[in-house]
Amino acid sequence: AVGGWLGWFMGGCDGLLYALIAFVVIDYLTGVMCAFADHTLSSEVGFRGICRKVLIFLLVGMANILDVAVIGNGSVLRTAVIFFYISNEGVSLLENAGHLGLPIPQKMKDVLEQLHDKSEGVSDDASEDEEEGE
């Protein structure tokens, strides 16, 4: 029952949603790794990070509801919200990887920054908040 409701709320489980889930989980894990490496691991900061990640999925669900109830068909808002957060999480993930000393392929940086720049028009404030890292 819960799975069915989540599927309806999120607009189904497609490749975009799976990609977002992967990016969110990996970004959170790399954020924890950075905090561990810096000796700043905090359950309070971690909980706040989890709350922010949950909010991402609530916003995807809200966008889906707006697509279905207001626009009527398609998934324009849902797709835009997912692209925004995939790019945001991807940029954050690369920052975390760089912070841990991992070299980042330039092409990957370019693609994520390009995607981030295109979706940045959705909300400049949200992208600044997410870039603070977890």
Show where each model-derived region lies:
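Juxtamembrane helix-capping/reentrant segments at transmembrane boundaries
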Residues: 38-59
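Hydrophobic core segments of alpha-helical transmembrane domains in multi-pass membrane proteins
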Residues: 15-26, 78-85
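A cytosolic-side transmembrane-helix exit/cap motif
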Residues: 36-45, 96-104
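Hydrophobic alpha-helical transmembrane segments in multi-pass integral membrane proteins
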Residues: 59-68, 123
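Alpha-helical transmembrane segments of multipass membrane proteins
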Residues: 4-5, 32, 61, 65
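Membrane-proximal cytosolic segments adjacent to transmembrane helices
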Residues: 87-134
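Short, strongly hydrophobic alpha-helical membrane anchors
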Residues: 1-9
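Hydrophobic alpha-helical transmembrane segments and immediately flanking/interface helices
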Residues: 69-99
